[in-house]
């Protein structure tokens, strides 16, 4: 807490005297920085965050890297993903230590490895799309390489091994080669093998705890009946730390406002989506000028709100106007509304690129080019389709006559709409 105390002193330099006292309730407190969602933060950006953490009095930074760190003799691991080199990790580790912050490797040794396992070179250790094949010697030789890299580049002995959300464990190549085995037994045996490697390297491991719950209950994450008998459950080594995570369960009242966003159709909601985003845009427009350090971030969200104020319910209005044969409204949409959205979207994309290239390595930004560039192109195509209908080149817009169906039916849990699932009813790989 030295740097937190120093921060308070600096803010009271003009005071003759001041007194402030805090009680520490956690031995360790910090942040997990996700560097596996395509954007790998630059070393300088991580150093900036380390300074912020120090000022806040935190002493742990977990670096979450599924395949975005260098491993000797594994060139496909993290290929074209902007992975941290060994020297970069050592530089971050040394810098963190200067501020009393422990840099903890947070890796994956079972699931969440789809970016690595997609390569044919990695097929020999693949169980299913993103899960390593348990019980196979080549798998543990590979994991040993991962842990040796961790041992050599991080000064801490603590390591987070991941192992969460491996719901298809043992149901891929393992099933075909060895037959069925209970998930609870597979996770225990796999943990034991990885624990042996950790012990040999002097590492103190922890994992996410959900798989021990899921494998024993065969239910959802942390779905355990109140009267469950846990006495016969497969249990982990007592030296293996279990880390609890759960953002699926809470009081339903906390989610009531959010659930409205997943209604069958925006039209079914009483919320004026356009006005909602317009209000956000107005607020952010004021904030953009208030922060020199974070002004660009505010500008991005300002433009995002501007885009959504026009686009969020655009499809609803287009279909309504088409169904009612209100051609003047369609003309207004194609000639004014869509061009305005495109203008805001292009500026939003420019700002997002500037933020990315400032904060992260360039790898991965190409996917935002595809996504946002695709939205821009689709808006232009939509405008042309409407114009062709209005000037008589086509007699109907068949895509607007298709009955609208909800992605999630009423019987299903309504969760996020994923771009790859809702951008089309067709499959990208089947396109001629």
Identify the function of each model-found stretch.
Residues 1-206, 250, 257, 275:
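Feature activates predominantly on carbohydrate-active enzymes
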Residues 8-17, 51, 91-94, 100-102, ...:
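Substrate-binding groove of N-acetylhexosamine-processing glycoside hydrolases
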């Amino acid at each position: 807490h030295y740097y937190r105390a120093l921060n308070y002193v600096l803010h009271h330099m003009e005071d003759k005297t001041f007194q402030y006292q805090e009680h520490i309730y956690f031995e360790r407190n910090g942040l997990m920085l996700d560097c596996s969602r395509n954007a790998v933060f630059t070393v300088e950006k991580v150093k900036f965050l380390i300074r912020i953490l120090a000022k806040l009095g935190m002493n742990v930074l977990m670096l979450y890297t599924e395949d975005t760190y260098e491993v000797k003799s594994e060139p496909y691991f993290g290929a074209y993903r902007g992975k941290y080199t060994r020297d970069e990790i050592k530089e971050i580790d040394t810098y963190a230590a200067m501020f009393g912050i422990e840099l903890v490797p947070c890796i994956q040794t079972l699931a969440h490895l789809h970016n690595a396992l997609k390569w044919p070179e990695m097929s020999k250790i693949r169980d299913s799309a993103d899960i390593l094949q348990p019980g196979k010697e080549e798998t543990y030789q590979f994991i040993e390489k991962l842990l040796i890299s961790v041992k050599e580049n991080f000064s801490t002995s603590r390591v987070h091994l991941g192992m969460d959300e491996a719901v298809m464990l043992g149901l891929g190549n393992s099933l075909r080669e060895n037959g069925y085995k209970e998930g609870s037994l597979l996770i225990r045996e796999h943990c034991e093998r990885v624990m042996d490697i950790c012990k040999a390297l002097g590492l103190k491991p922890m994992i996410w705890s959900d798989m021990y719950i899921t494998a024993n209950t065969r239910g959802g994450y942390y779905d355990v009946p109140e009267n469950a008998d846990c006495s016969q459950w497969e249990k982990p080594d007592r030296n293996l730390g279990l880390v609890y995570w759960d953002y699926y369960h809470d009081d339903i009242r906390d989610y009531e406002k959010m659930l409205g966003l997943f209604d069958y159709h925006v039209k079914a909601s009483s919320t004026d989506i356009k006005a909602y985003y317009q209000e956000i845009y107005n607020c952010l427009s004021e904030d953009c000028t208030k922060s020199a350090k974070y002004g660009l971030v505010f500008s991005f969200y300002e433009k995002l709100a501007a885009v959504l104020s026009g686009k969020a319910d655009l499809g609803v209005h287009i279909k309504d106007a088409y169904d009612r044969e209100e051609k003047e409204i369609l003309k207004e949409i194609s000639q004014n509304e869509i061009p305005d959205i495109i203008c805001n979207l292009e500026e939003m994309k420019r700002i997002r690129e500037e933020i990315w290239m400032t904060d992260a390595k360039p790898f991965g930004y190409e996917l935002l080019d595809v996504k946002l560039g695709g939205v821009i192109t689709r808006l232009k195509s939509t405008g042309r389709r409407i114009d062709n209908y209005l000037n008589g080149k086509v007699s109907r817009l068949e895509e607007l006559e298709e009955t609208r169906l909800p992605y999630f039916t009423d019987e299903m849990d309504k969760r996020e709409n994923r771009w790859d699932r809702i951008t089309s009813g067709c499959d990208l790989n089947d396109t001629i």
